[in-house]
C-alpha cells in the first residue's frame, strides 16, 4: 500500500460513525414527540380554562364579534319573599339608546352571590309586552310556559356555583338596541326569602359599535 492509499484509508476510518450514533437522533425525536404531545395536552387544558363568551369577563379572550362591543347593566333584586317573583326591564343608558337601530347579538346574565346568599333562585330573560306591569302573576306565567331557558342558581359552599351564567343569542331575531326595553330579567325565589343584600345580577348586552363606544370595553 502506498502513502496515498494509507492516507485515504485513514480518512475513511475517521468518517465512520461511532457505535450507537445513529440511534441518538431517533431517541431525541421520540423525546421531542412526547414533549410535543404533553405541550399539546397542556394547551388544550389551558384553552378550556381561558375566558370565553361565557366567562364573567364576557369578552376576555374571544372578544366581541367583529364590529361589536357591549354594555353592562347591574341589577340588585330587592327582598323577594319565598315563592315570589321580581322583574326588571332592560334599561340601557341614554348614550346607548340614542342609537336604537344598532343590532344586538347576545345577552348574557351572570349571577353573583353576596356572602349572605343561601337560597335557590331561578333567573331568566324574556321579551315581554309593553303593556305588562311585571306583576307576580305575569312573571309566574312566563316562568311556567317554558318558552325561555332558565338558570337555576343554588347556594354553593364555595360561594359561587360553577354554572352561574346564561347566554341568549338574538342574532337570528335581528333585535336592536331599541328592542331592549321590551326585554326583562325575571327572578323567582324558590325555597327561601331572598334578601336585598344577597344577590347581584350582571347583564351584558353585546351590540354593534356606536360613536361613544370608545369608552366602552373592546
Curated annotation (Swiss-Prot):
It is found in: Virion. Gene3D superfamilies: Cucumovirus coat protein, subunit A (2.60.120.530). Residues 1-28 are annotated as: Disordered. Residues 11-21 have a biased composition (Basic residues). The keyword Phosphoprotein does not apply. The keyword Cytoplasm does not apply. One of its GO terms (molecular function) is structural molecule activity. Its main location: virion. It comes from the Viruses. Keywords: Capsid protein, T=3 icosahedral capsid protein, Virion. It holds the Pfam family Cucumo_coat. Belongs to the cucumovirus capsid protein family. Capsid protein. Probably binds RNA and plays a role in packaging. This is Capsid protein. The lineage of its organism: Viruses, Riboviria, Orthornavirae, Kitrinoviricota, Alsuviricetes.
Amino acid at each position: 500500500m502506498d502513502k496515498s492509499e494509507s492516507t485515504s484509508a485513514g480518512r475513511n476510518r475517521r468518517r465512520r460513525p461511532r457505535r450507537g450514533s445513529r440511534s441518538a437522533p431517533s431517541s431525541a425525536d421520540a423525546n421531542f414527540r412526547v414533549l410535543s404531545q404533553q405541550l399539546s395536552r397542556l394547551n388544550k387544558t389551558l384553552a378550556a380554562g381561558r375566558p370565553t363568551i361565557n366567562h364573567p369577563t364576557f369578552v376576555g379572550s374571544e372578544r366581541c364579534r367583529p364590529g361589536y362591543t357591549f354594555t353592562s347593566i347591574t341589577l340588585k333584586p330587592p327582598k323577594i319573599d319565598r315563592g315570589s317573583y321580581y322583574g326588571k326591564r332592560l334599561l340601557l343608558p341614554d348614550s346607548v339608546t340614542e342609537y336604537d337601530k344598532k343590532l344586538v347579538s347576545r345577552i348574557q346574565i351572570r349571577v353573583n352571590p353576596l356572602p349572605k346568599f343561601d337560597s335557590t333562585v331561578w333567573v331568566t330573560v324574556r321579551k315581554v309586552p309593553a303593556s305588562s306591569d311585571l306583576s307576580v302573576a305575569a312573571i309566574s306565567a312566563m316562568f311556567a310556559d317554558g318558552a325561555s331557558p332558565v338558570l337555576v342558581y343554588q347556594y354553593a359552599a364555595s360561594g359561587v356555583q360553577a354554572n352561574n351564567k346564561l347566554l341568549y343569542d338574538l342574532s337570528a331575531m335581528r333585535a336592536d338596541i331599541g328592542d331592549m326595553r321590551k326585554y326583562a330579567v325575571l327572578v323567582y325565589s324558590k325555597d327561601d326569602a331572598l334578601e336585598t343584600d344577597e344577590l347581584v345580577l350582571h347583564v351584558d348586552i353585546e351590540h354593534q359599535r356606536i360613536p361613544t363606544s370608545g369608552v366602552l370595553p373592546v
